[in-house]
Amino acid sequence: TLFPYTTLFRSVINKPRTDYKGRIFCYVLDDEHYVIGGPVNNGGVILRWLRDEILASEVETAKRLGVDPYDVLTQIASRVKPGAEGLIFHPYLAGERAPLWNADARGSFFGLTLSHKKEHMIRAALEGVLYNLYTVYLALIEVMNETPNTIKATGGFAKSEIWRQMMADIFDTNLIVPESYESSCLGACVLGLKAIGEIDDFSIIEKMVGTTNAHQPNEDTVAIYQELVKIFINISRSITESYSEIA
């Protein structure tokens, strides 16, 4: 899983598989492997939107103090319990690719009440990004007909221990993140080595990745998220036709 401004969720398999519902894709990696998965538009870009539009004053203070604005963002989110007290965010601020494939999709908060504050909106937004990615994961499981026991993630989001644990809980799966957060370049180098015959297989990656951070799902939090994910999916389905009307 990669978390740049957009986000990718993929798995490597030995035989090609097709999603007849058109939610995810499958393509050749090499002579013996295929990649299956899907990209979403709304990953790290949601954090940037929160930073620039919701937390502008806090960000200015953070800059003066020499603090990473994204650390401030996730710390504010950590003040709120998992589930953001019933607030759900659909993160479709830039339309959406997998699994909706709908350029007209729009973002929304659902469940907003007078008791919700800025920190609830931030937590709900972070959770919403992962809820959406989880729907890609569900499609992947359906097509592969198996459930991975571990997810390996990389990208800017991986710097946040709070968001990493959030992902482990929402996906109810062990999460491993390399300390070298930006691993796309490393992966490209390894593919190049394999292509020119310098290595026989991809097992060398384990040594090259180095130290990793591991997170296990919290059983109580998993139960909360499983209920909210159902609501997230149901809402998205119920308003799909309205996206084109408001776009």
What are these regions (language model features)?
Residues T1-L8:
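Short, small-residue-biased leader/transition segments that mark boundaries at the very start
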